[in-house]
Every structure is written in structure tokens, then in C-alpha cells.
């Protein structure tokens, strides 16, 4: 509908009675304005009347103008919102870019679960022997390529897997070594893995299920000699009870036998007795009179345990690894928070606020600043503050303070906080801001001194500057204490601990704080109004009224911190963290004002849980370091150092469970590599690698994907008959061929010799382990796909991507009839040099393995300890006085 503009001509066909009606309506409206008492009746008449109303153009236009104004306002509002969201989005993008170098963390529950899920390795029971090889039946082929009914047994690789793409055989051995390290058992108890030999005459047992399966398959093979069958029927365990020894028969490849013999002779289990369990409990927990520990159980002589690997500071992650250190401290903080006890029987929030209101005489005052004293005080905040302080100190996590300068009560509570918590625990910017607020709001005004103008970047903190300027002994004395409040580094039971000052531990420092506060409240505040002075005095009065409770709170804080600290096994290195834990000063006020008289101490079960999680993480950390160091050494020996280094370090971090590896900056990765490279290799891991290194050729021979070399010729060579495969392009020896070492060729890059030989029509043998692929299609052989090998050498000068094709043409191949029916002699320009795998010989593969008849490995030593506490109200601190004296 189009609206008319102002002064537009009215419609001429309006009826007279309509105009009269309009006049009457106008009259009614004017009457209603004059006589308000009759407004309701006229309104009801208007609503109920049948008469129609006509709205004039002028009125329409006014409405439209209003709508336009409104819409303009709304559009401008929307535009502002769009701009705001754009700015916020840009900030988010910038934040995300920043986050790439600062690690982000998962929800707290998941980190806690990851930590608690790290269990000692011995919990995984070994059910089978370690094996690289397994015997397989392979068919035999006649001279014409047809398969015989007979089979022959060979040792083949159990996991014969090479990844696709450009691949070096040496990487296969590095992965094999990694796999051996992962599966390497800490102990082997053959009795636990032994299974029944189905073919035994007298229900004998063999060492494991795989040995039983091999025996079963050989027993059922028609070509097995009768003497072997009789031997299998006699296979059983031999027990020497007097020596607590049992011998089990096993079927193993000689290399596998060497591995398992090594594992049996180098087991990590040690005898377990009550003394070991007693000494396993942290000494400070044993000597703490608040905990009553009992060991009722007498352990059997066969009890064993695996000593946790608790070496200290081999990588020094606190030094120059900001992201890694931040992640470790965060996970430690979350774990510590979960074990700090909850405060009990806090003073009723309502009652305390009412009492504070009375002390402040708020009813008689209208000063806004004093009503702020009561904001944010609640029991939840008090409990949260208690947990945050202890957990941050246990994990050495840096804190930042959040406060409002006009809330004097927060600042006075902050004075207590700075008294009991060492300065190092706060990020410097936050510490300086808080100290400056205390000085310019409370201390300097009290003595009529001018405001402190602090220069950013000043090496001295505001309190250090103030200590030199203030003449009052008590205040200067308190400032001196705060400025020198640092952790003492003490080594206890081989672990570096960050210990609080003795004056804090026994609570005496609170008297020093109160003396300073009372001196401040007595000052005249000469440059400030009376109301200001009164507000500060009342804030100090509120805190000083709770002197006894504050002493108790300080003692309680110190006791819980030190008791839980006894359960930490890694050195407590102090270093500022990338991210911080926020602490509201109002929550500190809540803690100071609501702390009751109930003593809370960690339960023994909580302490043991905290200790176990710390031990398991620390032990796993050291074991993973040993693995990483061993693999770095192996990569170096296999000339893969440059290629694999970053992935080795990434795997190391992943296995520690708590790290988000993708967010760790590269510079820290390479620094970590340099630290790992300097560490010595553990002897067991080195011996295992030497075993693999000595037997590389045997392992290559057993693989269906690794050749020992390739022969390349300019002219085609005939496929030869082989019993194992039929017609194949395999060379079993290199007699008569000119040989070039593949490793030498890759290292020197001198291809002139090989190119000249090929162009002069002389076959050349490249000797060295390299991967190959198998093809049994006759059509692909006709297509001469193997020419690509020649092209790679002559044109591309690339040996690292060399992957020859092994052709197997026999009665199992597709289109074999082409060869058989047409007497076609297939040829190839390449031959794969492949040695025959080791034939399975039952007599040579039968080994007797010896282990203890029985022993029991206990992983949780603290399960034998029953523990209880004295009534918390009677709990005493280090000075043999009750923790909480103000009862």
C-alpha cells in the first residue's frame, strides 16, 4: 500500500455521515482528555461501538517517520554488532595463532584420567613367548611349473609388512626394534603361559599356545617322520621342585630362542618382603604421628616386585621447554587439586556477613566502599582458594591475582596471602600490581606519604622500594619478611622439595602481620578524608578479629602442603609457567573470614593414591626416555638419523600420555632430541639391538618382501625354474656378475660406472637389502613392466626408490596356460637376488626353556598396608602442637 505525502488531495467520494462520525470521534477524544474520570466508560464505548474509523494521511506519515527512525537506529545497532563480532572474530583468530605456540589443554577430567590410567608395565601378563619367525608350509613345483601335492616347511617372518611408497629396508629394522622394545617383558613366568600338548601321551604341557599349534600342525602333516611324531608325543614339562625350577619344551627359531633366553636371564623382578614395603612408604608419612600404619600380612617366599625406575632430571624439562613444562605442571596441578582435602565446618556465610555488617556498622553508613567488603564471600570460594593454593605450590604452577583496588578488604586479605605464599608463586606483573595497590591504598596513605609511581620493568618490587622508605619498625619488618619469603630447596629421600619458611609452618608470621596491620590502623592518614581512614581501620579490624583462626589456617595450609609433598617423586623444579592459575582476592577474603575450627588432613587412601599415580608416571617417563634413547642410537647405527628423528621424539611424547604433540613447537622438539641424544643407552636395550643387528641377513631371507640385491641387464634373461616358486626371475647366487654395493652407490652418488656397464651390454648386480614386489600375472610379464628399474638407474639416478618385480609363473598363476600350452619361454631384464629362507628342522628348533616354577609379582605394594588416622581434631604439626589451636 502506497502512503500519500503531506498536503495530498483527499478522496472526494467520502460520505457525509463518515465525516460527521469523524467529528464526533474527535469530540469524544477531547472530552476524554478534559474529563479523566469518565475515561474508562468512553473507552469501553469506543471498543464496543460499531462505527468505523478512518486514519488520516498525516497520522500515517507520523507513524512512518517514527518507524524509519527506529529502523535507522536498529540498522546502526546491527552494524555496530557486526563490527563488534568482526573484531571479536579477529581477536579469536589472533588468539588461535598465538595458541599454536602455547599448548591448550583438554578438559580437566580427561587429563586426570590419563594420569591415573598410567599403570606399571608389569601389570600386563605375558601369555606368549616373543617371536619374529614362524614355520610355514610352502608348496613344491615341478620342472614344468605345476604344483606338487607335497609341501615343505620354511621359517618365514611372522609380521612381513613393509609400508607402501619409497621405503628403505633399514626402516623396517628400526620399526622391528621399536616393536621388540614395546613387547620386551620385564619378567617371564613360563608356568603362566604353558598350555596342554594335545598329542602328548601323559597330558604334558608345552611352553605356550603357539608351540602347541606348531606341534599340532607338524603332527598332522602326512610327510612328518614317525620318529618326530613319537618325539612330539613325549614332549612335556620337567619339574625340579627342590630348586623351584621347571623346564618347558618350545619350538623356536634360533634367533627367537636367543631373544627369549635373554629375557629369561635378565628379568627385572626382585624378592619382596615386609622391609621393602615399609621402606617404599615415604619416610615422612611413616614418621607422621597422625597416620597409623599396619602391615598384617606375611609375604610368601615367592613374592616378587619390579622396582620402579625413579631416576631424576635426565631431561630437565623445566629448562627451556616452556610448552612441555606448562603441560606437566598443569596435569600435576589437576592431580593435586583432586587430592587436597575439602574444608569442613566452615563458619556460616550468612552469620559471618551479618557479624561483619555489625562490625562495620553498615546501617549507619552510606559509604559504598565498605559494602564491597562483603561481596563474593561464600564457602565455595573459600574451599576453592584453599585447594588452589596448595595444588599450585605442589605442582609449582604460577598464579595470577585478580582484584579490585577499591575493595580494601580484598587488599588486606592479599597482605595475608603475600605473607604465607612465596613471591615466586605469582607471575611478576600480577605480584607488582597487587603490591602497588596495597602500598598506594593502605600503607603510604597511613603515613601521609605521596603515591608511589612505579616504573615498569624496575628490578625492585614495590614492597622492596617501600621497605627502604618506611620508618615504622613493625611495618618495615613485615615488608622485609614478604620480600625475602622464598621456598627453601631441600633434598629429602633423593627428591628436591620446595619447603616453606619455618615461621609460616608454625604460624608465627601471622603475629608479625597483625603487628604491622595494627600499626597501620593507628596512623592518622593525614592526606585522606576521615571516611577513608575509617574504612581501612574497619577492614583491618575485621581481619584482626580472626587472628587465632588465621594462625590455624596458615598452619593447616602448611601441614597439608607438606604431607602431600611427601608423595611427590619427581624433583620440584621451580620455573614460571606459560599459563597461570587465576586467584580472586575475594576468594582469599572468603577463606580468611570463613575458616572454622575443624582440622582437615588427607586420608591415608588419598595419600597412597597420589603416591602411586606419581610413581607410575615417573617410572613410565623414565622407561619411555630409555626407549627413545635406544631408538635414536639404533637410527644412528642404521644411517636413518636425519630421516626419523622428529618422529622418534613425537612418539616419545605421545607415549607419555599427557602431551598434545601437535601443539609442541618444533624448536622444543629439536632441543628435546639434543637432550635425548646425550643420554646413555640402557644395557638391556642395547643388547637387544645388537641381537637384531647380528641377524639382519637371516631376517631378510625369511621375508617375502626383502631381497638381497637386483641384477639389471640390457638384454632379456630367461626365467629359471625354482622348486619354491616355479618359473621365476630369481638369482640364488651372483657368480659371474659384476657387483656394486647399493649402500656405496647411494652414499657416493657416482652412477658413471653402472651406466657404462649397462650401455656396454654387461649385466650388473646391485648388492644390498631392498624391497621388491611380487607379480604372478603372465600378461604383466609380457608388458615388460620391469623396464622401469633400468630407467630409474640410467635416467633418474635414483636408487632409494628402486623396487624390482619378482615374477612367479606357476600353475597357481593367472593365464599359466599361455606358458604351458605354447611352450613360451618367459624372459625379464631384471633378476631379484634372493637367498633361500631357512628350512624348518624340527630337531634344531626344539629348545628347553627354564624358569622359576612359580612366583607372584605384586604391582601395588601399598595394598598390603592398612592405614588409619587419628581424630583430625587431635592432629599435630611438626612442632608437636595441634594443627588447629583455636578451639
From Swiss-Prot:
Subcellular location: Virion
Cross-referenced InterPro entries: Rotavirus_VP2
Region (5-fold hub): 1-87
Keywords noted in UniProt: Capsid protein, Inner capsid protein, Repeat, RNA-binding, T=2 icosahedral capsid protein, Ubl conjugation, Virion
Principal location: virion
Segments of skewed composition (Polar residues): 28-44
Residue numbers spanned by region Disordered: 1-46
Basic and acidic residues: bias regions: 9-27
Pfam families tied to this protein: Rota_VP2
Region described as Hydrophobic: 401-421, 429-449
The keyword Ubl conjugation is assigned to this record: yes
Modification after translation (UniProt): Sumoylated with SUMO1 and SUMO2. Sumoylation of viral proteins seems to have a positive role on viral replication.
GO molecular-function terms, A-Z: RNA binding
UniProt KW Transcription keyword: no
GO cellular component terms given for this protein: T=2 icosahedral viral capsid; viral inner capsid; viral nucleocapsid
Site (Interaction with the intermediate capsid protein VP6): 231, 235, 846, 848
Record comment regarding domains: The N-terminus binds RNA. It is necessary for encapsidation of VP1 and VP3. The N-termini of 10 VP2 molecules form a cylindrical hub underneath each 5-fold axis of the inner capsid.
Subunit details: Homodecamer; each decamer is made up of two conformers of VP2, called VP2A and VP2B. Interacts with a VP1-VP3 complex. Interacts with the intermediate capsid protein VP6. Interacts with NSP5. Interacts (via N-terminus) with NSP2.
Family from the record: Belongs to the rotavirus VP2 family.
Physiological role: Inner capsid protein that self-assembles to form an icosahedral capsid with a T=2 symmetry, which consists of 120 copies of VP2, with channels at each of its five-fold vertices. This capsid constitutes the innermost concentric layer of the viral mature particle. It encapsidates the polymerase VP1, the capping enzyme VP3 and the genomic dsRNA, thereby defining the core.
Protein name, entry field: Inner capsid protein VP2
Organism: Rotavirus A (isolate RVA/Monkey/United States/TUCH/2003/G3P[24]) (RV-A)
